[in-house]
A protein has these predicted regions:
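Amphipathic protein-protein interaction modules
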Residues: 88, 96-102
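Short S/T/G/P-rich N-terminal loop/turn motif that feeds into the first structured element of a domain
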Residues: 1-77, 83-93, 107-127
Length: 127
């Protein structure tokens, strides 16, 4: 399936001190495993994931000039896109059933999240 206007997604951005990235990396590995075990790429059983990606990069003093040096933080971006609200709801239900993973997500979000689009519609796509 392709991503189009009206699909629903999440994007969460984190700024993590470099000395705390091991914890975030472990969470990302656990979350990816959860996604692979419980989500579908096709069919009619939700959650059907259209796109799942995680980005990681040093935070630069000037993001347009990598030669400007690093801040001592690492940036993470977690993006998920579903066809509609049914996929989002199925994802949330399954995620909350994994209590330890969900508790870690809540703690990491409370500690390091700088922006979150949760259940937001896609407003532009290469359709």
């Amino acid at each position: 399936m392709s991503i189009k206007r009206g699909n629903i997604g999440f994007h969460v951005s984190f700024v993590v001190p470099n000395d705390a990235t091991e914890r975030m990396d472990q969470f990302i590995a656990t979350h990816e495993q959860f996604m692979r075990e419980s989500h579908h790429l096709s069919g009619d059983q939700e959650p059907i994931i259209l796109s799942y990606s995680v980005f990681k990069s040093p935070e630069f003093n000037n993001p347009f000039d990598p030669n400007s040096g690093e801040t001592g933080n690492t940036l993470y971006g977690l993006t998920e896109i579903y066809s509609g609200p049914e996929g989002v709801q199925a994802h949330m239900t399954l995620g909350q059933q994994r209590e330890a993973m969900f508790a870690e997500l809540v703690d990491l979000t409370n500690t390091y999240c700088v922006a979150g689009l949760l259940g937001a519609p896609v407003i532009a796509a290469m359709e």
